[in-house]
Amino acid sequence: MATYSSDRAFTDMVHHTLAIPKIYAHLNWQPYALSVEKATEIDMFKGIDYVFTNDGFKTVQERFREKKYQQYTDFTIRYRRDQNPLIERHQSEYYKMKAAYFVYGITNCLKEDIAPCTDFIKYAVIDLKKVYEKLDDGSILIQDNGKHFCQIVDGKMVCPVKYNTDGSSSFFPIEISFLVKLWGNEMLVAQKGFLTAD
């Protein structure tokens, strides 16, 4: 299992060497410098990793995966950490995330060998505010139903709660192609590789 520090090093490397030139530059989003204190505060309490500017501020939560996850067509949001001894930490990023956008990318390398890391196999920039609107109005449902993948049921996306094998936390997937099938491109700001028409 990867350690937090190795995960952080991988994420930082991908952000600087891939995401900035291959995603944000194409969107004309410019990095906005924050003090270390402010960056730490908004990360811990609002689930915001970075802030960009382009016709106002763009707040972003990032998640990058290694190439062994390339078969997946969804992005995941951490849900709960019920095994954490601190009750105030049971609710995970789903409950605290205030970022306006979620940037999810799958790289062409492994965490253990980042030298060949030159591109994204897939990435998506998701409008999280619109996703949360669909969660709030019941158009996207999170259910602990024992399923492995999201389904479309009666015009709604039903997403299962999944559990990490080490029991540390749960998460739920959101199928990117279902967002487009149900609501067009309104939630998808940019993408590569997640839709079959690429």
Predicted stretch roles:
Residues M1-T59, R63-D198:
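Nucleic-acid endonuclease domains
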